[in-house]
Regions:
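N-terminal accessory scaffold of Fe(II)-dependent oxygenases
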Residues: 2-344, 352-390
């Protein structure tokens, strides 16, 4: 009979040998670093870490998508990595909220909680280039706090704006502008709806995988810059409601407050630009953003009439491939990215963005004025003539 203690000791030795061997393999595969001229050991470790974590599991399809390697500073000519807008909307039609397995991320993504990576992100922000951040403690707190019951309670006392569309497309329109422009007919209807009812519809849309031809509802709320932490939005998102300049609000005096958009599966916000630096925090769910630099303005069919209710928005239906082809989208530069809960996307001033809600989603953003050198403004003025700050 084999002694129990001897057998246990033998098993333990085998376990230690196996785990030790695995540790050695992992060390050589993952934790050895490459020596770069002019790059510190710490920075080199970050670069290798980015290779190890160059993929992520998408919350929608559980498909592993690739991510680009981490950059310490903006390269002169190789970032952003563009594809043609026609290729972008053809490979993944905006009317389809399901990400294809071939989707690749090309936009930089930095760890906000890491001081070194945060310094990289600051360089990209100052260069007016788009990027994403993650591991932001204040934002992660909100992603956990804003569950259904919390939002239902808070929304009882919040003012909201709800739009209805017979399809999944929502063209922005301003009811305060001249409605007589070309016998203007609003593209969506304003409706009265309680948040609880809207949430039920949004959750059902995910469950049944609603199509682009069904009626959609877009729920919007927000607070002004003068809210001063009075509402739950500015209290919970204090990074966007600061009295002192920070990474997210670089010019408090020009802060536009906080706008929150509650989206349901498939909702498309048509392409447009904003005149301020834009930090977009994804609180729940995920959205797809297609970005275009300001110099592409002339090719995007942007409404230039300052009196038009949909001023600064594209009149082109990007999900209509025939329109995209005839409008020359094959010569338009585009970036395609998915922003997931807990991430913040930086959209530089005057960059165009086209937004698709991939599922029930909550997104809050804050804009804080144009960059010091006014990057992007000249291209927009050459394209549209007079430009109204927005």
């Amino acid at each position: 009979m084999v002694n129990t203690k001897t057998r246990d000791a033998s098993c333990l030795r085998r376990f230690i040998c196996v785990t030790s061997a695995l540790s050695v393999i992992c060390f050589f595969l993952g934790y050895s670093y490459v020596v770069f001229y002019g790059v510190s050991e710490e920075e080199s470790q970050h670069l290798n870490a980015s290779k190890l974590t160059s993929s992520f599991v998408d919350i929608l399809s559980k498909t592993i998508f690739e991510r680009p390697e981490l950059l310490m500073e903006p390269p002169e000519d190789s970032y952003p990595v563009y594809a043609s807008l026609l290729e972008t909307v053809t490979k993944w039609n905006p009317d389809d909220p399901e990400p294809p397995t071939t989707f690749k991320e090309t936009i930089q993504r930095f760890n906000y909680s890491d001081e070194l990576e945060r310094s990289y992100a600051e360089k990209f922000r100052n260069a007016e280039l788009p990027f994403k951040m993650y591991d932001i403690p204040d934002i992660l707190m909100v992603t956990r706090k804003w569950d259904d019951e919390y939002l239902k309670q808070k929304m009882k006392y919040a003012s909201a704006h709800v739009e209805e569309s017979k399809s999944n497309h929502f063209m922005y329109w301003n009811g305060n502008r001249d409605r007589n422009v070309r016998q203007y007919v609003p593209p969506t209807d304003l409706v009265s709806m309680k948040f609880d009812d809207w949430l039920e519809i949004a959750k059902k849309a995910d469950e049944i995988k609603s199509t682009n031809s069904t009626t959609h509802y877009y729920f919007m709320t927000g607070v002004s810059a003068s809210d001063n932490l009075r509402s739950y939005i500015s209290q919970d998102l204090s990074l966007f409601s600061t009295k002192k300049n920070n990474f997210f609000v670089s010019n408090v005096a020009a802060n536009k407050g906080i706008q929150c958009r509650f989206g349901m599966r498939g909702i498309i916000a048509e392409a447009h630009f904003d005149s301020g630096r834009n930090m977009v925090a994804m609180i729940k769910g995920a959205k797809r953003y297609i970005l275009n630099p300001p110099h592409e303005c002339k090719k995007l069919g942007i409404i230039s009439d300052l009196k038009h209710p949909s001023y600064r928005h594209s009149i082109i239906d990007w999900s209509d491939i025939d329109q995209a082809t005839s409008r020359g989208f094959d010569s338009v530069n585009a970036i395609d990215t998915i922003v997931e809960a807990g991430e913040v996307l930086y959209i530089p001033s005057y960059w165009f963005h086209y937004i698709v809600s991939l599922q029930y989603s909550v997104q809050c953003n804050s804009r804080s004025g144009s960059p010091p050198n006014g990057e992007g403004q000249t291209e927009i003025e050459e394209c549209l003539g007079s430009v109204r700050k927005w």
